Amino acid sequence: MSNYQQESSYQYSDRSNNGQQQEQQEKKEVEHSSYTHTDVKVNMPNLIAPFISSSAGLAQELVGEGFQASVSRITGASGELTVIDTEAETEEARRDLEAKAREQELLSRQFEKELERKTEAYRKQQEVETEKIRKELEKQHLRDVEFRKELMEQTIENQKRQIDLEARYAKKELERERNKVKRVLERSKFHTDIQVNMEAAAGSTHSGSSSVAVSESEKFQTNN
């Protein structure tokens, strides 16, 4: 049963006695429109408004146009039933429609406020997260600078060590070359020829000398 109290009048026509009678159903149509504008930065969900069939519509569907109902227990003949809305029912339906529109508008405003609240909360959260990321990037930049500084210092230190290493082994190589030259000089032979010629009025003098020197270093071997 519906929550609304409805009054319906039914008219039965006796085709054999009174002839066919037809009554026009009086209806009052109420058109209601509402407009709501929402300007938000997020996509508004497009929700389909729920449709609920009222009891009046259900009654119209059951005993509406072209429906023949048997009422032989009442009149002994078949008759056509027509649902007629009373003025009270029409007024009640109009009030319900207006109340429904007001509630829909209220729900829309509540939804908009909730959406704005969540959007603002999300924006603030994003600002906090962005600030954290910015600070972390600054720390990362400082770490990068320190790393590059340490890398440069290590590179310079390594180059110094490489230079010291090259110098040390170059010194050893020079020492070996010096020893080689010394050994060659100790084992070398010297040959000197000296010729002296003197010319004078009384005569001439010739003097010459030749010398050969052999130098070889002595080697000592010790057996333990």
From Swiss-Prot:
Induction section of the entry: Expression is highly induced during desiccation.
Basic and acidic residues biased stretches: 24-38
Entry keyword set: Coiled coil, Cytoplasm, Repeat, Stress response
Coiled coil: 80-191
Function according to Swiss-Prot or TrEMBL: CAHS proteins are cytosolic heat soluble proteins that seem to contribute to the anhydrobiosis in tardigrades, but their specific mechanisms are yet to be identified. It is possible that protection during anhydrobiosis might occur via the stabilization of vitrifying small molecules such as sugars, but not via the direct glass transition of CAHS proteins themselves.
Additional information: Trehalose, a disaccharide essential for several organisms to survive drying, is detected at low levels or not at all in some tardigrade species, indicating that tardigrades possess potentially novel mechanisms for surviving desiccation involving tardigrade-specific intrinsically disordered proteins (TDPs).
Name the record gives this protein: Cytosolic-abundant heat soluble protein 77611
Organism: Hypsibius exemplaris (Freshwater tardigrade)
Gene, per the UniProt record: CAHS 77611
